[in-house]
From Swiss-Prot:
Domain of life, per lineage: Bacteria
Gene (UniProt): csrA
Alphabetized InterPro entries for the sequence: CsrA, CsrA_sf
Name the UniProt record assigns to this protein: Translational regulator CsrA
GO molecular function ontology, one term from the record: mRNA 5'-UTR binding
Keyword RNA-binding: yes
Amino acid sequence: MLILSRKQDDSVIIGDDIEIKIISIDKGSVRLGFSAPENCVILRGELKEAITSQNKQASQSDDIKAVSEIKFLLKAHKK
């Protein structure tokens, strides 16, 4: 992990087309601005974790299992 010290209005460039700019620094909070191509997904860490967790739960739900069982039974019935 690269760790940098930056002041307000400073920026960090990643690759050729991603810029992270320090917008403001307050007590216990830093506001960042991101400039990146539209195809680049930018998410807060906690949001990414929540999405991953929900996707994992959804894939293990009883509904998904029931659909899988129905698909299996339909395939077996066609034989």
